[in-house]
Regions:
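N-terminal capping/lid subdomain adjacent to the active-site entrance of alpha/beta enzymes
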Residues: 1-147
């Protein structure tokens, strides 16, 4: 059973200012979500957006408030193993809030993977690759310097 849902708003400093067309970021704000289950297992999820409300209708601050105020009370007491039921309840009851819902789903998957002793990738059908390509964003405002 889901016993508690905790959120933490974190600002991760950037190496250098990250200049976007809509904002300059000196830190990346994100929300960490911890779901504590009655069997002692904890699952972690994350929600992040870029540039406050410039990226979409959710900001890190609204994600935290909406999880704390609306989502957590709705899912506390539900079966943490029944992820589809939890997510269906959220879909039926709460409009939008895709980033917040994703963080909840990720935390539930993390908890279930820990409970079963397998990585989340196995819960989702198995790992497809051993490494991922990395993108380096050129966003200092000085393209020549970035390159």
């Amino acid at each position: 059973m889901i016993e508690a849902v905790d959120t933490l708003l974190v600002d991760v400093p950037t190496i250098r200012p990250h200049k976007l067309s809509v904002a300059t970021m000196n830190a990346q704000a994100l929300v960490l979500v911890r779901i504590r289950c009655s069997d002692g297992i904890e699952g972690w999820g994350e929600a992040t957006t870029i540039g406050g409300l410039n990226y979409g209708e959710e900001s890190p601050e609204s994600i935290k408030v909406n999880i704390d105020t609306y989502i957590a009370p709705l899912i506390i007491g539900m079966n943490a193993n029944e992820i589809a039921k939890v997510m269906n309840q959220l879909r039926k009851t709460i409009q939008g809030n895709r980033f917040a819902k994703c963080a909840i789903e990720t935390a539930l998957l993390d908890a279930k993977g820990k409970r079963l002793g397998i990585p989340v990738s196995e819960l989702l059908g198995g790992r497809l690759r051993d490494e991922l390509p990395v993108a380096w964003t050129l966003a200092s405002g000085d393209t020549k310097k970035d390159i």
